[in-house]
């Protein structure tokens, strides 16, 4: 089965010195993909070029995918930016959770509290309780993360964090 193959590959990768640092990636220590980590941690990024996406603070947008439009307006960034949205607090909370849970280190309760001004349990208490009880989420050293079993059903778990 796919589950067994996934677990077998994980064993082989570990034997060769790789560690799982996100639910779909392995790397040797110090060689983790910084781009992915920045994305999962919701750090600002600026996409340059045709169709490139950006997240700057609470603003998310992408550049046009139309080459003619892009070339015609490339000196005026506001004319090539499409799909602009201002993220709400709820959007940011949901992204904090479902993007952060993609990393094996999970999410920091302290960082959630500092950024949003409220405890993670005040927003997601029932969801956290449900998945901890099922053994799909674990908590250790102030971090909440997917268990090994939770990784296999991560999409279902993460969907419950959408507000």
Positions of predicted regions on the chain:
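Minor-groove-contacting beta-hairpin "wing" of winged helix-turn-helix DNA-binding domains
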Residues: 143-147
């Amino acid at each position: 089965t796919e589950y067994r193959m996934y677990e077998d590959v994980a064993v082989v990768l570990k034997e060769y010195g790789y560690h799982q640092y996100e639910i779909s990636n392995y790397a040797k220590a110090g060689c983790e993909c910084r781009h992915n980590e920045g994305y999962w941690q919701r750090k600002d990024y600026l996409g340059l070029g045709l169709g490139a996406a950006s997240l700057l603070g609470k603003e998310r947008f992408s550049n046009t995918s139309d080459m003619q439009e892009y070339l015609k307006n490339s000196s005026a960034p506001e004319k090539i930016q499409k799909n602009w949205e201002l993220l709400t607090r709820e959007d940011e909370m949901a992204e904090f959770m479902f993007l952060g849970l993609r990393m094996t280190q999970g999410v920091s309760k302290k960082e959630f509290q500092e950024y949003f001004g409220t405890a993670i349990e005040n927003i997601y208490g029932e969801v956290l309780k449900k998945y901890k009880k099922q053994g799909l989420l674990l908590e250790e050293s102030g971090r909440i993360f997917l268990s090994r079993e939770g990784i296999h059903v991560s999409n279902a778990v993460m969907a419950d964090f959408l507000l």
